[in-house]
Amino acid sequence: LWLFPPNRDSQGGSSWWLGLDPEPVLVDCPPLTEASLTALRQLAGTRSPRILLTSREGHGRLRRVQERLGWPVLVQEQEAYLLPNVEPLETFSEHHTTASGLRLLWTPGPTPGSCVVFAPPPKNLLFCGRLLTPWGPGQLAPMRHARTFHWPRQLNSLAKLRDWIPSDASPQLLSGAALGALRGERLVPFSGWSDVAENC
C-alpha cells in the first residue's frame, strides 16, 4: 500500500497504490510529477496495473498521467463523459469486480459517479473516495460542501454501503480527500466511521 503526496489538481486529494496480483491498482490520480511517474513504474514492475477513479474529484490531470503510462482506466459510467480522450477507458454501472478481486460499488452523492473500492481480507481495506472525509484524528464522516452533487443521495449511499460490506469484515478506511485533519494518520479504523461530523 502506497500513498502519494496531496494532489493540488484535485483539492489536495489523496491517491493510493495497492500492489495486488495479477493486477495492481492506482486509486485516483496522483500529482503529475516525474517523481510520481517514476514511482508508479517502479511499483508496477512487469505487471499491468489499472487506474480506478472514485469520482470526478479524483481525476486531477489523469489524461496526462494515463498518456505517459498507458494503463487502462475504470470509472463509473456517469462520469465517463469527462474523459473523452482517455483510452482504454472502461465503465461499470452498479457493481464491478476486478481481476484481483477488488469490489466496486456505485455510491452517488459527492458526485454523480462516485464509487468505493473494497479489498476483501486479507487486505481488508475500503477506499471510500470523497464519500467519507477526514474531520479529526481517527475519524471520517460525510461532509456537505459547495461541490456536493446530491446530499440525500450521499446519505442513502452510506446506508447502502454499510449493508454491502460483509458482516464479518471491518475494513480499514482510506479517504480520497485531503488527509490533513487526520494529523499524520493515513488509515482510519472501521470504528472511526461516523455518520455525522460534529463540526458540521
List the predicted regions and their residue ranges.
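Flexible, charged surface loops at secondary-structure boundaries
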Residues: 18-21, 41-47, 67, 120-121, ...
